[in-house]
Design a protein with these regions (language model features):
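Conserved catalytic motifs of ABC-family nucleotide-binding domains
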Residues: 150
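Catalytic Walker B motif of ABC-type/P-loop ATPase nucleotide-binding domains
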Residues: 154-158
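Conserved ABC ATPase "signature" region
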Residues: 79, 98, 102-125
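Helical segment within the ABC ATPase nucleotide-binding domain
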Residues: 169-181
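Conserved ABC transporter NBD signature motif
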Residues: 57-67, 73-74
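Conserved ABC ATPase signature
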Residues: 129-133
Length: 244
């Protein structure tokens, strides 16, 4: 499914968290969203999920405005993973996945949970309470939760934060493979520049609620004459600071 963001803005108390952003994610494409804390990434994701009402602008999914979708329909096609969203601490990993699976109307739920536990290496702690897990384990559970309904659109916020390098690399490979097999459209918000270069077809850079550059990693790097995406991002952000 394709997503088009058109002139999207959100104000809180007369201050813009997001201001007039425009971009498109094609079907089975991954777009990376980069920016410092407070740049508007989380607000943008919240609007795309239908959790935050835009001040102005439109979100178009497969040529239909998000406002025309019933909540159940949105739940069936879209999901979200973030290590910063707390899971019920007193419930086990399995119980958490069961709850979310029922919420999303997943058929053959037991099989789906077993499948994700195998794919994301959750089996060793599937019956542990989430409050007893490490931050890296919680992150993998959050990713499993986001895939429970096999969404066509996946919004990922720092999916490999707090993961050991080997596990982080495994998760990145898994996301790549899952996208290819299931034709999933992905928005990836990350501070990991190498991760964005590896996983994303194109990149959006944000600061203070605005898009300051976008294109493929190669296009952006070449445009600013730097060696890699991290150097390029730092140059652009500092240039914006000097202008401000």
């Amino acid at each position: 499914m394709s997503i088009e963001i058109k002139n999207l803005s959100k104000k809180f108390n007369e201050v813009y968290a997001v201001k007039n952003i425009n971009f498109t994610i094609g079907t089975n494409k991954t777009i990376g969203l980069l920016g410092p804390n407070g740049c508007g990434k989380t607000t943008s994701i919240g609007m795309m999920l239908g959790l935050i009402k835009p001040t102005t602008g439109d979100i178009i999914i497969q040529n239909k405005n998000i406002n025309t979708f019933e909540r159940n329909k949105l739940l069936s096609i879209m999901n979200f993973a973030s290590p910063y969203v707390e899971l019920p601490k007193k419930l086990s990993v399995k119980q958490n996945l069961q709850i979310y699976g029922r919420l999303y109307g997943v058929k053959d739920l037991s099989f789906r949970i077993d499948e994700l536990a195998e794919d994301l290496n959750l089996k060793d702690f599937i019956n542990k309470k989430t409050g007893e897990l490490s931050s890296g384990q919680k992150n993998r559970v959050s990713l499993a939760k986001s895939l429970i309904n096999k969404p066509e659109i996946l919004l990922l916020d720092e999916p490999t934060a707090s993961l050991d390098p080997d596990i982080g690399d495994y998760v990145r490979s898994y996301v790549q493979s899952y996208k290819s097999k299931n034709k999933v459209t992905i928005l990836l918000a990350s501070h990991n520049m190498a991760e964005v270069e590896r996983l994303c077809d194109s990149v959006i850079m944000m600061k203070k609620g605005k898009i300051i550059d976008q294109g493929t990693s190669k296009e952006i790097i070449n445009r600013h004459g730097r060696a890699n995406l991290e150097e390029t991002f730092l140059k652009i952000v500092r240039s914006e600071d000097e202008v401000a």
